[in-house]
Design a protein with these regions (language model features):
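Intrinsically disordered, low-complexity terminal tails of fungal membrane proteins
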Residues: 1-27, 210-231, 292-318
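Membrane-water interface of alpha-helical transmembrane segments
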Residues: 42-52, 75-78, 105-115, 141, ...
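Seven-transmembrane alpha-helical bundle of G-protein-coupled receptors
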Residues: 52-62, 78-91, 115-128, 154, ...
Length: 318
């Protein structure tokens, strides 16, 4: 259902970009002379094949590495991360087509669909990972929301925010200027709500770590030294870095839309890579080294049934 809502939003938004073009224009001329002022060019620039090639290679290789990690160490519940990395690389590859044919509606819509849709899988992976990490540590009492509800609650918020965005994008495809402006405001509200939802998730995660550090020294400090690939705090740091990358991208997309499709952010390719593509890349490539399956053993969990002073602690149910 979440993916269906996301798909509807992306299709509507892509249509809105096309509908915003002036009507009764003369046939397009040379698309490479002045792309910024070319009403037939939805990007308003010609994509760089160098940046596209480097970015595509990074994402494709990372997706393959993540798939190998999953095969080697398990944690199939992170499958959405692997799929999202592959689909994002497909979106980047489509930019090769736009560099040759910048007027192609079909290529643009497909490119936009993959590039904007794929990060949904990255958010979902972080939601799922936090739930598994908390259950593995038997530390549900330090999380404000039950671990098994974290994913459900935040994915539900995604469905609502994407539905709002889809509604706004659909209104933006009309010919009435007032309706178009209203649709853009609704779409921006949905995007801002999505950003707020993930920011809330990140805050929830930070509070969980702080409470764990203050109240559960038997979990925070290992009784015996363990290698880095068995130290849950290394995985926790990786999740934190992933959240930072996703938040950067979320802020970028929100500000970009508030400026409009001809704004500075939307029409500057370097900002697309610097504030969208590469922050998201950091958010996923970190799991190549810190693959959750190396840290989280669903059979053997951290034993927290006894605290430092010997007081029994109830084990969190899976």
């Amino acid at each position: 259902m979440a993916w269906a809502a996301t798909l509807a939003f992306l299709c509507a938004q892509s249509m809105a970009v096309m509908a915003a073009r002036p009507k009764n224009l003369p046939p397009p001329g040379d698309p490479f002379i002045d792309p910024y002022n070319d009403p037939y060019n939805p990007l308003r620039y010609i994509p760089s094949n160098v940046l596209t090639g480097v970015s595509f290679a990074l994402y494709f290789l990372t997706a393959t590495a993540l798939a190998l990690c999953m095969r080697r160490w398990g944690a199939r519940w992170m499958m959405c991360l692997v799929i999202g990395a592959y689909t994002f690389s497909i979106g980047l590859a489509l930019r090769f087509g736009l560099s040759k044919n910048p007027h192609s509606k079909g290529i643009y819509i497909a490119e936009y669909l993959f590039v904007v849709l794929s990060p949904c899988a990255f958010l979902a992976a972080d939601y799922i990972l936090l739930g598994h990490l908390v259950r593995y540590l038997n530390a549900g009492q330090y999380l404000f929301i039950r671990p098994d509800r974290v994913m459900k609650i935040f994915l539900a918020s995604d469905i609502v925010t994407f539905a709002i965005q889809a509604c706004g994008g659909g209104m933006s495809t009309t010919q009435d200027q007032k309706t178009i402006e209203t649709g853009q405001h609704i779409f921006l509200a949905g995007l801002a709500a999505q950003m707020a939802s993930f920011a809330l998730f990140s805050a929830l995660y930070i509070v969980f770590l702080v409470r764990l550090y203050r109240n559960a020294p038997e979990i925070w400090h290992h009784q015996t030294p363990v290698p880095w690939y068995r130290n849950w705090k290394a995985l926790a740091a990786a999740l934190g870095l992933s959240c930072v990358g996703i938040l950067i991208r979320s802020v970028y997309r929100t500000v970009e839309l508030s400026e409009g499709f001809r704004g500075h952010l939307a029409t500057t390719e370097s900002l697309f890579y610097g504030l969208d593509t590469y922050p998201l890349f950091v958010a996923i490539v970190v799991y190549v080294l810190f693959w959750p399956g190396r840290f989280i053993n669903e059979v053997e969990r951290v034993d927290t049934r006894e605290t430092v002073n010997g007081t029994p602690v109830a084990e969190e149910k899976a």
